[in-house]
Amino acid sequence: MELQFLGTGAGQPSKQRNVSSVALKLLDELNEIWLFDVGEATQHQILRTNIRLRKVTKIFISHNHGDHIFGLPGLLSTRSFQGDVGPLTIYGPAGIEDFVKISLKVSRTKISYPIHYVELSEPGLICEDRGFKVYTDRLDHRIPSFGFRVVEDSHPGELLIDKLAEYNIPNGPILGKLKNGEQVALADGTILDGKDFLGPEKPGRIITIIYDTRSTSSIAHLAKDADVLVHESTFAGDESKMAHNYYHSTSVQAAKIARQENVKQLCLNHISARYMGAKAKKLENQAKKVFPNTILVNDFDRVNIPMKGSKK
């Protein structure tokens, strides 16, 4: 599991940062890639990575401002040229379906695969797919805006080899059933419960994506215990009044959420073009004083999210 940042800027593209998009790579888990927001030129950014559009199966849109959606029509069109691609689902606020369909209609673009739309309105579970759940809640922005929490199911514990050795169980169907936590009957009539031969479950990973918003209480439960929190940081920590007026957040506000909600790593994202070089470093340093495990991400940065308990 890995995050790759395709656009980390705010409002408009700059030479240093494209507008918003981040890819959640679930290649080992699902052989899929999920995108969160698709700002203008996202598909150009993808050309500079190893991402293949045929692997993109879900797109989550936080809100309908142009710097988060203007890349959608072109990306969807290009995906049609990738051969035999499967269906794609777009999750987003009311209006996202109209935006896509009108853009494709006016440009007379034909899509070779089904697109399903899930328009968001209420907080809660919006997606469940083979061991992953995605939850959403409203944020506080000028227009309807949503944050996302991706939760991986727990994994079975490790097989207790020493305990199995007591019963002289060889490799084969019986061992396979025990690994799956099933009950089995031995030749002598002994009943073994696979759950007794597995260590504690390994908790799944949690990724939280927060785009445009003021500091608001709904972020807390979306971010709770996240392995990685990607949080907008449009303003510096000493500009909270300006951030509030423009319906955005500061680096320090993001760091306070990370500390409060037991987050493991904070990625500052959605960086205004006013912050370059030393000024960008200032945002990161301000946040680190509150939450040390903070990084300010740049376009094409990759963040690995290892299994809990992994030494990687």
From Swiss-Prot:
Binds 2 Zn(2+) ions. Its cofactor is Zn(2+). Coiled coil: none annotated. It comes from the Bacteria. InterPro entries: Metallo-B-lactamas (IPR001279), RibonucZ/Hydroxyglut_hydro (IPR036866), RNase_Z/BN (IPR013471). Zinc phosphodiesterase, which displays some tRNA 3'-processing endonuclease activity. Probably involved in tRNA maturation, by removing a 3'-trailer from precursor tRNA. Belongs to the RNase Z family. This is Ribonuclease Z. The lineage of its organism: Bacteria, Bacillati, Bacillota, Bacilli, Lactobacillales.
